[in-house]
């Protein structure tokens, strides 16, 4: 902001490229360091990719998270998410792209409100889905189409949906692009250190 003010002091009509300004803000938000594992970085990369896509025929390999089945062990600090029906490992907690809670279904009053977007019994809006980064097992479903269903790669049960144009979360927030997994279709599996096993059982 100070640099921009200095430039405009000399040239009042000077403008900054919005994309470059967005990159600078992202860099600042990440603590002035490039962190490809940051949720902010992952979300920004996907947003930029979605703006360029018309029919995704060839997606960059780096946008896909590693399939957890190809990893021998999940770090103790991470939660593993499995298909509730067949127990196939689907993604890790580091793949979840959190978002700011929206203002509820009323934010999309002009659109058809889905059942999952209705108010909960206690009057509070809740996120009934996880929005995640694409995982390697999703690639065949994503190629050549802008939206579709996300099915378990093992048992083919429906897990959620995706849309490069974006989807509405039940909290009212519009997420673009969206790779949405319904919480009711997955189970959390937490890995405990060996020393805590006895404590966890009791």
PLM-predicted stretches and their roles:
Residues 1-130, 136-147, 187-202:
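PTP/DSP superfamily signal
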Residues 95-101, 164-169, 180-186:
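Short cysteine/histidine-rich zinc-coordinating motifs and their immediately flanking basic loops
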Residues 32, 176-180:
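Short amphipathic alpha-helical segments with coiled-coil-like heptad repeat character
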Residues 107-110, 167-173:
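Cysteine-rich micro-motifs
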Residues 91, 160, 174-177:
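Short functional micro-motifs and their immediate structural scaffolds
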Residues 142-158:
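Cys/His-rich Zn2+-binding "zinc-finger" mini-domains, especially FYVE domains
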Residues 83-86, 152-155, 168-171:
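Short cysteine-rich clusters marking metal-coordination/redox-active sites
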């Amino acid at each position: 902001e100070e640099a921009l003010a200095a430039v405009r002091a000399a040239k009042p009509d000077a403008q900054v490229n919005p994309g470059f300004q967005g990159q600078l803000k992202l860099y600042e938000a990440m603590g002035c360091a490039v962190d490809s594992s940051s949720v902010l970085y992952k979300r920004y990369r996907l947003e930029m990719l979605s703006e360029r896509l018309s029919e995704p025929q060839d997606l960059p390999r780096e946008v896909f998270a590693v399939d957890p089945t190809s990893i021998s062990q999940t770090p103790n600090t991470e939660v593993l998410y499995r298909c509730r029906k067949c127990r196939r490992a689907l993604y890790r907690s580091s793949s979840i792209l959190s978002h700011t809670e929206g203002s509820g279904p009323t934010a999309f009053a002009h659109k058809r409100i889905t059942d999952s977007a209705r108010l909960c019994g206690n009057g509070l809006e809740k996120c009934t889905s996880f929005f995640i980064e694409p995982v390697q097992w999703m690639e065949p479903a994503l190629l050549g189409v802008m939206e579709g269903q996300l099915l378990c790669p093992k048992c083919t049960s429906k897990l959620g949906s995706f849309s490069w144009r974006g989807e509405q979360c039940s909290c009212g927030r519009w997420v673009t692009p969206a790779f949405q997994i319904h919480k009711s279709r997955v189970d959390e599996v937490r890995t405990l250190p060996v020393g805590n096993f006895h404590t966890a059982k009791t």
